[in-house]
Amino acid sequence: NFQNSLGSAEEKLPTFSKSWQWKELDIFREWCLPDVSNEEFQETFNALVVSIDQIPKAFMHRDFHCRNLLLCSSNELGVIDFQGAMFGPVTYDLVSLLRDCYVENEEDWISREVASFQQKLISAGLAFAKVETEEFMRWFDLAGLQRHLKCIGIFNRLKIRDNKPDYMN
């Protein structure tokens, strides 16, 4: 089992720390809000960074979306692109997949899948998952906001600097 083979992710992987979050969010500031000062930007987004830092942490692929999933010849799911893996918010990969930049999913389906994921964590004996559904959904939305701000910054950088506008579609 993949999860069991990880051992202690916290000891083996870099942590998705506040400073790492700021590094990623700065991509958004630099490429989407170049006239906003770093001080003003940090003042605006500090509550997001602090809130994300409080979400329980687990192994985080960090680039878990449809283009990194493969159907292997054995009809098993293959996952690629692990080089960015970290120890971070438990909902980060879930939101990366369910609110994938390349696929539009129905909100009702997303809500059901988030609830199902939370129940699986509870069934696995993970005490931190025993929070109100609204709180778990809040963790999901916060991680999604941070991730998508980073993605918007990266996609805008690809458009402006690298002349690759297709990512913005």
Regions inferred by a protein language model and the residue ranges of each:
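Active-site acidic catalytic loop and adjacent metal/ATP-binding pocket
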Residues: 2-3, 46-94, 104
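A cross-family kinase active-site recognition segment
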Residues: 1-36, 55-57, 86, 167-168
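Active-site activation/catalytic loop segments of kinase-like enzymes and analogous catalytic loops
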Residues: 26-35, 90-128, 142-162
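Short, solvent-exposed segments of well-ordered alpha helices
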Residues: 19, 65, 85, 104, ...
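Histidine/acidic-rich helix-loop-helix segments that form or flank divalent-metal centers
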Residues: 127-138
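Glycan-recognition and catalytic cores of secretory/periplasmic carbohydrate-active enzymes
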Residues: 11, 15-22, 66-71, 86-88, ...
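Central P-loop NTPase core of STAND/AAA+ ATPases
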Residues: 37-47
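Regulatory N- and C-terminal appendages and interdomain linkers associated
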Residues: 161-169
